[in-house]
Amino acid sequence: MGHTLLKNFSTLVTAFCTGLFLLGGVSSDAKATDQPNVLMICVDDLNDWVGFLGGHPQTKTPNMDALAAKGINFTNAHCTAPGCSPSRNALLLGVEPHRSGLYPFYNLNHVDSESLSRFTPLPLLFRKNGYKTVGLSKVWHNPDNKYRQDEQWDEYRMYGTGKKDKSLIKDKGYHPEPFNKRTIACPASNPLTDFGDYNAAVHAARFLGREQQKPFFLAVGFILPHTSFIMPEANWDRFLDPISEPPIKANDLADIPQVGQSNAQIYVEIPVRRDNAWEEIRRGYLAAVNFTDENVGRVLDALEKSPHANNTIIILWSDHGFHLGEKRSFSKFSLWEEATRTPFIIFDPRNDLRNGKACSEPIGLINVYRTLCELTGISAPDYVDGMSITPWLKNSELPKEQPALITWGRGNYSLRLKDWRYNRYFDGSEELYNHRKDPYEWTNLANDPDYAPMIQNLAQKWLPKQEAPQVTSGRELYNVADADQPMKNVQSHQRFVKQYNKQRLQPPLD
């Protein structure tokens, strides 16, 4: 009993001292001995088409914009992997794919337990440290929401997925892709209570409105804007004007290695069935983003009105970005800017004198685990990769040399620096882009001999020296790289090219 009391007291003192050291003081509205709560908002497939990142001139995201203006807005943040499963596994386990071997999409319930036993899921770590942990909807990739569920969460509830939301629409004939029926852009007339993301937001708001007996870790996942783009009519109707297309170069792929093109699965989800399909898909994406912003607002408004407002750290991230025509792609699954760049915001009410800033240094989402640990005074496990980015909460202009590392399949890596991107694929082919002069990554400089020393230095200094073998599973894996299934993606890419040629849809941009 005495030992437990002493341990709890020590934890509180550590949290208090950590807050003072890192952030320079605690808000006078919060009790100094309160361990901070955490509200983690996880959005699916959200790219930079948000107001605070300026990705599209017609986007409407007032709630997320307000949060970005209130906290620290990391404008050069990047996912660890441009796919739902590997990105979330890396963030929630705190380990890079090249060290875990979790490269493709998994159902973690069917992975050999020995491959995962050395990792501690982030919610479980918080629960072991006295937090009440609550998970709502898509926090892990959907098949993994039951992974160690009873261990991780005091309370967990999964709401509707995109597949279920298809039942909301009566006209199921608009499948604009010739070979795939997943991408749909369509409003639904159903009441809000029929939408899973709305219900997740309402559940979170109810939780936040109640007094809690101990600090909480509340993770709220929103599935939109993941395909299918099905949202209430009110959100669709805000985007009835002609939709501006993003900057696109017709021959953009001419200097891209074949492995880069096939690895990105460029032709898998291109909507070309109708003449206006591209615009309709972009309209659907913007409307889906707008609906998600409303749901984020519901949660943030509830927190603001709650007794927890002055003692809750808010963190918002997306698992990766999304292409909407750039480089002929309407998906993620690439090592290019549209797929790797992600919204990322941290608001800590104890950081009041330094909040309201933007940070343009390269930040990887692999750093979320250590950062939340440091902000709450919890010790991170020794194996955890990344670093705490609390120094950039104190000084958003602090230079950062280390690039963000993005992995898409074993042997395929991207390094995102402040002004450069360097990609290297498993076969040795490369890409290099100067973002200061070429923000859309249209000119691959990798074959220019003037940049050979720079490429050599980047590769030697920052690319992984060792790669864990791909973890096996009791089920067939999705999105396995050609390094582990030779030529599969290349051959798939070639088949799609033939199909598009046969229907005279190739090339879709030139």
Question: Which ranges hold each PLM region?
Answer:
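N-terminal secretory signal peptides that target proteins for export/translocation
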Residues: 1-8
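Formylglycine-dependent sulfatase
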Residues: 7, 16-18, 28-425, 429-430, ...
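Hydrophobic membrane-targeting alpha-helices
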Residues: 21-25
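A contiguous, mid-protein "functional segment" used to position or interact
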Residues: 449-484
